[in-house]
Swiss-Prot record:
Keywords: Encapsulin nanocompartment. It comes from Pyrococcus furiosus (strain ATCC 43587 / DSM 3638 / JCM 8422 / Vc1). Belongs to the encapsulin family. Family 4B subfamily. It comes from the Archaea. May self-assemble into facets and potentially into larger complexes. NCBIfam families: encap_f4b. InterPro entries: ENCP4 (IPR014418), ENCP4_sf (IPR036216). May be the encapsulin shell protein in a type 4 A-domain encapsulin nanocompartment system. Its cargo may be upstream glyceraldehyde-3-phosphate dehydrogenase (AC P61879). It is found in: Encapsulin nanocompartment. This is Putative type 4B encapsulin shell protein PF1875. One of its GO terms (cellular component) is encapsulin nanocompartment.
Length: 99
């Protein structure tokens, strides 16, 4: 269930990045993603996914026609802060409380 929650948040992050790119006139069609990011990638993502080991928990959403030519044609996102937050929530839950 926790993975589903993370996956839904990742989907929201991806959709926001896609919208930003589309608002700037681009047509995002690829995701370059690290292996950690891919673990939480929803199956219904409509972009072609390429795994790049070095990206870790990050991903780059881009319009492949302009990637490397125009900086605004790509958006890098990271789920590392989200994963760290979930880890801290687990730690806090395990702390015994005094009653």
């Amino acid at each position: 269930m926790e993975n589903n929650n993370i996956m839904s948040q990742v989907k929201e992050i991806i959709e926001a990045a896609i919208k930003e790119l589309e608002d700037d006139g681009f047509e995002p069609d690829i995701i370059l993603a690290g292996p950690i990011f891919i673990r939480y990638l929803p199956e219904d993502v409509r972009l072609k996914v390429y795994e790049i080991e070095e990206l870790g928990s990050d991903a780059i959403i881009a319009d492949s026609k302009y990637l490397g030519q125009i900086k605004k044609a790509a958006k890098r996102i990271s789920i590392d802060p989200l994963l760290q937050e979930k880890e801290w929530e687990k730690i806090i839950e395990e702390i015994p409380t005094q009653e």
